[in-house]
């Protein structure tokens, strides 16, 4: 079976980590090897860039274009050093976020032109597209409430409600325009989200469990 690149997307507080735990449980049950990773981050250098973007400790504003480029510098490291090699070896890759998050957060939220972001993906990631995107949709107010229960808000989580409304809109538009993305209502119970994820994976892997 050809290796798959599966990405979980969604706003902060949508439950991506929980969803990934369901994907892990499913793949392990079906004896499918996989690595589990995240963005921003995924490699040592990418994690350093993540920390700079989310927890800027310097008395210097990060421009929206700079934010995008720092995230993409980490993404290139992540893709070339971890994602692509794993897929080439026949190992499935499951990632908490990929380039859709830049389209939504930096494109929708920050207002960076989407064409710039697509160009980065085409030029530096060989136009890599996930085999499956599971988008967890949630109202930004509920998402931020959930996120704040986990810990102190990071730099992006402090961006405000309007930012997240714009971010959500781009996510939903991306799902509508994609043939390999499925939206799940993340406000539903954990049990219902788990059930939907298993059904999606059954169909994707052509399994009948």
From Swiss-Prot:
It catalyses: dTMP + ATP = dTDP + ADP. One of its GO terms (cellular component) is cytosol. The keyword Mitochondrion does not apply. Pfam families: Thymidylate_kin. GO terms for biological process: dTDP biosynthetic process; dTTP biosynthetic process; dUDP biosynthetic process. Transmembrane segments: none annotated. InterPro entries: P-loop_NTPase, Thymidylate_kin-like_dom, Thymidylate_kin_CS, Thymidylate_kinase. Keywords: ATP-binding, Kinase, Nucleotide biosynthesis, Nucleotide-binding, Transferase. It comes from the Bacteria. ATP binds at residues 10-17. It is an enzyme of class 2 (transferase). Its EC number is 2.7.4.9. One of its GO terms (molecular function) is dTMP kinase activity. PANTHER family: THYMIDYLATE KINASE, UMP-CMP KINASE 2, MITOCHONDRIAL. Phosphorylation of dTMP to form dTDP in both de novo and salvage pathways of dTTP synthesis. HAMAP family: Thymidylate_kinase. Belongs to the thymidylate kinase family. This is Thymidylate kinase. It comes from Francisella tularensis subsp. mediasiatica (strain FSC147).
């Amino acid at each position: 079976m050809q290796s798959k690149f599966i990405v979980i997307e969604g706003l902060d507080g949508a439950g991506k980590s929980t969803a990934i735990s369901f994907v892990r449980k499913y793949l392990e049950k079906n004896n499918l090897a996989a690595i589990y990773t995240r963005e921003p981050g995924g490699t040592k250098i990418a994690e350093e860039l993540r920390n700079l973007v989310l927890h800027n400790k310097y008395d210097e504003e990060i421009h929206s274009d700079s934010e995008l480029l720092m995230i993409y510098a980490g993404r290139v490291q992540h893709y070339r050093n971890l994602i692509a090699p794993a897929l080439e070896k026949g190992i499935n890759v499951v990632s908490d976020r990929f380039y859709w998050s830049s389209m939504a957060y930096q494109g929708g939220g920050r207002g960076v032109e989407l064409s710039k972001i697509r160009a980065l993906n085409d030029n530096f990631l060989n136009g890599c597209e996930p085999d499956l995107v599971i988008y967890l949709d949630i109202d930004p107010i509920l998402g931020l409430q959930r996120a704040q229960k986990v810990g102190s808000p990071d730099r992006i989580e402090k961006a405000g409600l309007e930012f997240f409304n714009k971010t959500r809109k781009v996510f939903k538009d991306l799902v509508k325009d994609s043939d390999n993305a499925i939206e799940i209502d993340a406000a539903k119970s954990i049990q219902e989200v788990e059930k939907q994820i298993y059904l999606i994976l059954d169909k994707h892997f052509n399994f009948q469990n």
